[in-house]
């Protein structure tokens, strides 16, 4: 389960960041922000090599002592970043992929809302519920 989920706009500003309430939120803002360099690196590397454009999952961006940071990018260059506790060894790569697909589907639902202006912060109860289902339960 994730300890932080972030949606970052094409222009690299946060549309949505949510972390577990017991953790330091500023630390996760920093972690997500620093991971954007790795995301940009991977996107530019994918552009040079002819890769399947349907593969949106970037995989493990970088591990830290306490966390593992994973990335995903949409066709419109919106980035999803998920921070997972390193001690959770039972979480496999295909489970992370399915969590990102679920997040992407929920993001698509937000974008299809006629009252949502693209580029505005995401304020959707359905999106919040999707993210909550991916988060580590609060103790």
Swiss-Prot record:
Q: For this UniProt record, give its keywords in alphabetical order, as a comma-separated list.
A: Cytoplasm, Endoplasmic reticulum, ER-Golgi transport, Golgi apparatus, Transport
* Any one biological process term the GO annotation gives: endoplasmic reticulum to Golgi vesicle-mediated transport
**Subcellular locations according to the entry:** Cytoplasm, Perinuclear region; Endoplasmic reticulum; Golgi apparatus
Q: Name one GO cellular component term.
A: perinuclear region of cytoplasm
Q: What is its main location?
A: cytoplasm
A Pfam family matched by this chain, by name?
Sedlin_N
| Role of this protein | May play a role in vesicular transport from endoplasmic reticulum to Golgi.
Name the PANTHER family on file: TRAFFICKING PROTEIN PARTICLE COMPLEX SUBUNIT 2
Spell out the family assignment given in the record's similarity comment: Belongs to the TRAPP small subunits family. Sedlin subfamily.
Name of this protein: Trafficking protein particle complex subunit 2-like protein
- Which species expresses this protein natively? Xenopus tropicalis
Gene behind the chain: trappc2l
